[in-house]
Every structure is written in structure tokens, then in C-alpha cells.
Amino acid sequence: MRLAFVGLGKMGRSILKGALERGFLRPEEVGVLGRTPERSRELAEPFGVRPLTRADLGMAERVLIAVQPRDFPALAPEIAHHRLGYISIMAGISTSVLARRLDNRRVVRAMPNLAVVIGESSTALTALKEAREAEDLAFARALFATVGDVYEIPEHLFDAFTGMSASAPAYLAVVAEALADAGVKMGMPRALALRLAADALAATGELLKGRHPAQVKDEVASPGGTTIHGLHALEARAVRAAFYEAVEAATRRGHELGESE
């Protein structure tokens, strides 16, 4: 068995789905462990993979931990095996804490974002030396490449990555909602306003892949036109500063979660 999933929430299911659809994993190479044998069967059945008990984990080459961080301290002794590699997608839990709790230094830390559900995640990876040497990091890189882009970054940047990239879908959803509400205020039907806001964000994302943000802004904002007046209103409300503060607050909270361990 190449990979055992411990827990299978929204992100875990999306990772498994992407790996199966892209052919990186076959169903017979995967197992899923839930809180109870019944839950393991419920989680495994839709994907045609194997339901596991805790005793079965030792048959896996690697384990992907996809539980809530608060559940990990109690769970760790039950899933710890010296010969396995571990990949964690739990927010705020460092590689050093993973290694200590699991009594195993073959650990990879990963941070995908919500776009994993559509195969467009930006996933950060970091790993201890032992995980690199055992090719656990290479395995994780290939696994997460099935659901988006992968970035290997130093662990000291993980909280900032979480505060900016992992949280970005929520920030941008607020932007989309605010744009739509503004359109409704101007008399636009809500369904149309929501669709236009979503289309605008998607199109802007594509434009930004090949351009600096300032270039996109300048191309839209003609002298004396409507857009530059709208931008002036945003600057007057310190929208840039609000994003700075949001990323700083989320980064700080990620650090606090790690410190609590």
C-alpha cells in the first residue's frame, strides 16, 4: 500500500480524487482510516480504496495525516510507526512537533488551499532531512502536483504562506461578495452581479499570470476615467492596508497555533 490517509475531510478527499484521476495512485494502492471501522468504510467506499484499522497502518509506505490539528496529540501515539513516512496537511503543526509526537523524523509538512477542490491549489512543502533522503518529499511533490502548483519553501515562511496564500480564497471571496453587493446597490440583479464578480476575479487571475499587478491596473485605469475614480475611493478607504493587516493577523495566528504545541 503506497499511501494511507488518516482522516478524509474536504481537502483529503480532493487530494485523493486528484491523485486517482491523474493516475498517480491506483485504488488498490490506497487505504483510509476513520475514527471507527464503520467510518473507515464510509470514507473508502466512494473511491474504491481500502478501509483500514489502526493495525493496518503498518502495511503502508507512507501516511497522509488529514485530521484537525486539535485531534493530533491524542492520535499521534496510535498512528506512530518507525518505518513509515508521514505527510501532514494540518495547519500550524511544525515538522519538529510532528517528529516529536510521532517519534519519527521522516515527516513532510504540506499546506494546500481550498482551490485543491478544483485541482488549482497552491501547496507549500517543507521536510526534514530524513524525509528528503527517503524520498518522502519527492513523493509529496508528485502527489500535490496532481491538484495544482507546488512550492518548496523554508519552514519559517509557512505561517506567512498560510496567512497569504492558504487564506487568500476567503479574502477574495469577500472581495467578490462586496463587488456583487455594490452592483446590487447600483440596481443590478443579484444573480448577475455575483456571476460578474466571479468572472472578473477569474479573468484577472489569468491576466496576472503574465503581468505585474500594476500593469493590469494601469491598463484598465485610463486618465480621468471611471476606474481611476473607483481606485481613488479604494485608496481613501485604505484597502491595501486592510490586506496587509489581514495577512499579518492570519500569519500571527498560525504562529500562535504552532507555539501552543
From Swiss-Prot:
Localization annotation: Cytoplasm
Keywords: Amino-acid biosynthesis, Cytoplasm, NADP, Oxidoreductase, Proline biosynthesis
Pfam families from the UniProt entry: F420_oxidored, P5CR_dimer
Pathway given in the UniProt record: Amino-acid biosynthesis; L-proline biosynthesis; L-proline from L-glutamate 5-semialdehyde: step 1/1
Enzyme superclass (EC): oxidoreductase
Enzyme Commission code(s) on record: 1.5.1.2
Family stated for the protein in its record: Belongs to the pyrroline-5-carboxylate reductase family.
Protein name: Pyrroline-5-carboxylate reductase
Source organism per UniProt: Thermus thermophilus (strain ATCC BAA-163 / DSM 7039 / HB27)
Gene: proC
